[in-house]
């Protein structure tokens, strides 16, 4: 194992220890230098960031891993804001294919859209979920001036934040 979900949400159960003879793990983020806010506080902070950007007609580009992290964020927004989100949620194709798999397995996620399905003016209020590999790609240019963030435990590391040159 490698990832330990400390809090359950609609996208995934929390880690459950099981009795076994041998357990092999890699757990970088278990080191004492990492401290984690409760999931709801992180989602509320993301929602405030998105709302501030939407109010300024600026897209919010949130880089996150296409499998797992993106769906955790979507589930968190649905639970925190329900139907009162500040704009459309636009997903990169890599994220959207994973959303389809989650929905097919019965996980309820908020509505998400391909970039071509959202009016150009509405893109300035959108939350854009994209994998880190999409950074500085032609795909992102269509959102114009945007605020960007990266949802990853690696952002707890000061050097990573500096190297990525991301707003948050």
Q: Regions from the language model: what does each represent?
A:
Residues 8-9, 70-74, 136-138:
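Short, well-ordered alpha-helical microsegments
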Residues 1-68, 79-82:
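His/Asp/Glu-rich metal-coordinating catalytic cores
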């Amino acid at each position: 194992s490698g990832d330990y979900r400390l809090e359950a949400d609609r996208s995934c159960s929390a880690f459950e220890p099981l009795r076994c003879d041998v357990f092999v793990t890699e757990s970088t983020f278990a080191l004492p230098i990492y401290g984690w806010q409760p999931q709801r506080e992180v989602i509320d902070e993301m929602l405030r960031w998105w709302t501030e950007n939407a109010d300024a007609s600026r897209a919010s580009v949130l880089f996150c891993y296409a499998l797992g992290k993106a769906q955790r964020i979507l589930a968190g927004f649905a639970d925190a804001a329900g139907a009162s989100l500040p704009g459309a949620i636009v997903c990169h194709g890599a994220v959207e294919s994973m959303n389809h798999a989650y929905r097919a397995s019965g996980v309820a996620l908020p509505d998400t859209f391909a970039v071509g399905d959202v009016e150009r003016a509405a893109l300035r209020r959108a939350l854009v979920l994209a994998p880190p590999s999409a950074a500085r790609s032609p795909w992102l240019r269509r959102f114009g001036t945007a605020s960007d963030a990266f949802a990853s435990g690696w952002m707890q590391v000061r050097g990573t934040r500096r190297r990525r040159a991301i707003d948050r």
